[in-house]
């Protein structure tokens, strides 16, 4: 259902790149949009299928939401590779305006490529306009300050992809994994403050650091520089959110996962703030691990961990590591939460090679679990729990499993080998609702 205001936004919305080298509106412009007195629905979800299998799995999540009686209007918004190629902007202004109006988005997946390859795929008439490709999901997080990313990684009993280790006397153990990663979502190495062939003023600033002497004889043409930016406010928000979640849901520890023994300033700030925040949560232990050691420990004793908090890149890494213990990216959901808006998405990519398979074989569970996180955010937790129980029952029964759960290589032939289709998995979940 599309409201008249939303239809007008989609029909007349700016289909150009906004005149700013493909970069979406700045914070000041967005603030104005957020404050506009739009005709606003309290329950309109902006759906963004995006690219590849995003177009396959998002409709499956909507089927499940409808089955549990979730009442909302939806408006589909444009995002992704198609709009980069045809407009020079993978995050069109009309999509930004819809998110600013309705505050809640459900997102599928995007295709993202290096900037030189992206430039070659622009429409010919756009190739001389100076557009530079950017990740629309990263831009969305920064534009709306969706600074808190939650990535729960929980094992479903009976999932054949669950982590199993050798126990005493060669017996098999399947530890219960129940971890929630809080990833700082807008800063760090993903902030996008970087240069190839850095300009003279950047080089001059770098030269003020004594350790840059090692690069004094390297020409700027041979240098690439990325800045790892942490701010105290962002660290305090993500660490506090992690501790509050741990207290609310009964986790006994919060682990700061960084690398302060080497990256002393930025990782050191996160750990320092972790220690300060923990003083207000005396019932919860503060642990700290280095990212490299954490990747070892998660494959040794994953059940030891409850809530983990990390910067942008390390949070990305450790959450994928834990996802691998509970079935892989087909089970990995996430929430991007800011003070004004929230967007919910599976963490998998667009897998374009599977987009046009008919019937589809991809696993819709990560997308459906992301929709559950949206329900939690909207205080519809009872509906979310019903869906999670239905998913658990389907997995435990073991009769309707996608190709990844059967450990089959992808491709059209997996159905003949017993793999369920995307729709069959959703149907099995619906039957238990």
Language model features with spans:
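Short, Lys/Arg-enriched N-terminal segments with co-localized hydrophobic residues
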Residues: 25-39
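Glycine-rich phosphate/diphosphate-binding loop of Rossmann-like nucleotide-binding domains
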Residues: 45-68, 204-292
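N-terminal beta-loop-helix "entrance" segment that forms/cooperates
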Residues: 71-96, 296-298
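Flexible, glycine/charged-enriched surface loops at secondary-structure junctions
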Residues: 72-73, 249-258, 281-289, 380-388, ...
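Glycine-rich phosphate/nucleotide-binding loop
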Residues: 134, 298-400
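Buried hydrophobic positions in well-ordered alpha/beta secondary-structure cores of metabolic enzymes
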Residues: 51-54, 103, 182, 242, ...
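Active-site rim loops that border cofactor/substrate pockets in soluble metabolic enzymes
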Residues: 78-84, 266-308, 312-317, 405, ...
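N-terminal glycine-rich phosphate/adenylate-binding segment common to multiple enzyme folds
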Residues: 85-212, 225, 313
